[in-house]
Swiss-Prot record:
Pathway: Cofactor biosynthesis; adenosylcobalamin biosynthesis. InterPro entries: Class_I_gatase-like, CobQ/CobB/MinD/ParA_Nub-bd_dom, CobQ_GATase1, CobQ_N, CobQ_synth, GATase_3, P-loop_NTPase. Residues 248-434 form the GATase cobBQ-type domain. Pfam families: CbiA, GATase_3. GO terms for molecular function: ABC-type vitamin B12 transporter activity; catalytic activity. Catalyzes amidations at positions B, D, E, and G on adenosylcobyrinic A,C-diamide. NH(2) groups are provided by glutamine, and one molecule of ATP is hydrogenolyzed for each amidation. GO terms for biological process: cobalamin biosynthetic process. Belongs to the CobB/CobQ family. CobQ subfamily. The keyword tRNA processing does not apply. Keywords: Cobalamin biosynthesis, Glutamine amidotransferase. SUPFAM superfamilies: Class I glutamine amidotransferase-like, P-loop containing nucleoside triphosphate hydrolases. This is Probable cobyric acid synthase.
Length: 492
């Protein structure tokens, strides 16, 4: 069997709930797969076969002990700006669409999503489905293929997740249930109150009141837990709290308007202060500056130029501050970007920041999506110390390198001193070797002690984190009530 996890709003903990359920089933030896029909996120992941899906579904797949695949997130929307999103269908670029045009295709896309779900269910037996945003968006009911229309098609039991941390949990739950369509409301089998601060037992009267008001059982009150797993979307940036506020080493990640895959830096956040600095914020005083990925290189480059970021980068370069570009950030560090109307409406040529001798051309609607393993081969104090690294590429455009040294075998570029380099490789600094190489140099330059990164880590978190999440969830949720919705094929 299967169930659907819906939420009262965005960022209430649906993704973590699905990951926890997947891990809990995995720990019981029960096969399960995650599923989200439609995800809107700029944090994505590349599967073994080169399919692109939302990073949350990849996290959930690894929690379930299986490889991520396209059917787990058949529709991925990647906002490009001005109400335009790239639609990734079954792991491959489909087209760029205005939101109004997208809504005209929801019947077809829903059919694709249901087919993907059925393929997963036929193979795994159990599927944990995640909704999107808030379930009770009444103005979208006729085109909501991630919540209401999907629930209507699948007719699965629903668990509703609410976030008590932001306040108003009674209104969240009662209002959502009251607004659900009459044919959907009876499917709601339970409520989970998430992100409680303090002793959950103190909310016992609240549990009783919720059950009295709604007639739906509360399956658990889950305390807030700071378990290191990748973030799904840019809402998470605002919630980031410096875990290492006392460290003298500080890294600036330029918060691009269309920042993507900022999960690249979450391992670094565990060890030094990482600030996400918006355009217009100062970059002076940092030990390292990173330009991350973006869904629209041309538009975000223009935004940085409007705020004088290029001059700040040149001054940082004069001070010997390491400057690193990842994916779109790598493209921006080059001399020139030639766009044939792929990134913007009209063909044009744009000057980059000129710190790397590379030129990027967008000549066709082709996307590179591939997992990679490379050895760092560049010069200087950082790159040679990285060793072999794993990651993945997700990018439009092709970059030609001038006479500069390559940063990684066959890819990337570096200045002769190795203090400015760029790569298309996402997940670079999720490799402990790469993180140690950077942090050791920054600590030495700052004149402070360096504590190496030793924890097991992958691009999507350590297995221990998944286990911690499952244990935390199971401790506070009525698992007996939930387990009746899943089948154990071992007994068949």
């Amino acid at each position: 069997m299967s169930l659907i996890v819906l939420g009262t709003a965005s960022h209430v903990g649906k993704s973590m709930t699905v990951a926890a359920l997947c891990r809990a089933l995995y720990r019981r030896g029960i096969p399960v797969a995650p599923f989200k029909s439609q995800n809107m996120s700029l944090n994505s992941y590349v599967t073994v076969d080169g399919s692109e899906i939302g990073i949350a579904q990849a996290v959930q797949a690894f929690a379930a002990g299986i490889e991520p695949e396209a059917d787990m997130n058949p529709i991925l929307l990647k906002p490009k700006g001005d109400s335009v999103s790239q639609v990734v269908l079954l792991g491959r670029p489909y087209k760029d669409v205005q939101i109004r045009d997208y809504y005209r295709e929801t019947d077809t896309l829903l059919a694709e999503a249901v087919s993907a779900f059925e393929r997963l269910r036929s193979r795994f037996g159990n599927v944990v489905v995640e909704g999107a945003g808030g379930a009770a968006e009444v103005n979208l009911y006729d085109r909501d293929i991630a919540n209401i229309r999907l629930a209507r098609s699948l007719r699965l039991p629903i668990v509703l997740v609410a976030d008590i941390e932001r306040g108003g949990v009674f209104a969240q739950v009662y209002g959502t249930l009251a607004l659900l369509p009459e044919d959907i409301r009876p499917l709601v089998a339970g409520i989970i109150v998430n992100k409680f601060r303090g002793d959950p037992g103190l909310f016992a009267p609240g549990v009783a009141k919720l059950e009295e008001l709604t007639g739906v059982p509360v399956l658990g009150v889950v305390p807030f837990a700071d378990i290191p797993l990748p973030s799904e979307d840019s809402l998470s940036i605002a919630d980031k709290r410096d875990r290492k506020t006392g460290t003298p080493v500080r890294i600036a990640v330029v918060r691009l308007p269309r920042i993507s895959n900022f999960t690249d830096f979450e391992l670094l956040e565990e060890h030094v202060a990482v600030d996400y600095v918006p355009p217009g914020g100062t970059l002076s005083g940092y030990d390292c500056i990173i330009l991350p990925g973006t869904k629209n290189t041309v538009e975000d480059l223009a935004a940085l130029n409007r705020h004088g970021v290029g001059e700040e980068l040149r001054l940082a370069r004069e001070r010997g501050v390491p400057i690193i570009g990842i994916c779109g950030g790598y493209q921006m560090l080059g001399r020139r970007i030639v766009d044939a109307g792929i990134e913007s409406e009209n063909p044009a040529e744009y000057a980059g920041f000129g710190l790397l001798d590379v030129v990027t051309a967008f000549t066709g609607y082709r996307k590179t999506t591939v997992q990679v393993r490379r050895r760092a081969t560049g010069p200087g104090p950082i790159l040679p110390a990285m060793g072999e690294v794993d990651g993945y590429e997700i990018h439009m455009g092709e970059t030609e390198r001038g006479d500069l040294s390559e940063a990684f075998a066959g890819e990337g570029a570096s200045t002769p001193d190795g203090l400015v380099f760029g790569t298309y490789m996402h997940g670079l600094f999720q490799n402990p070797g790469a993180a140690n190489a950077l942090l050791a140099y920054l600590a030495k330059r700052r004149g402070v002690a360096f504590e190496p990164v030793t924890a097991e880590s992958t691009a999507l978190g350590a297995a221990a984190s998944y286990d911690d999440l499952a244990r935390h969830f199971e401790e506070h949720v009525d698992m007996d009530a939930i387990m009746k919705y899943f089948i154990d094929r071992r007994s068949e």
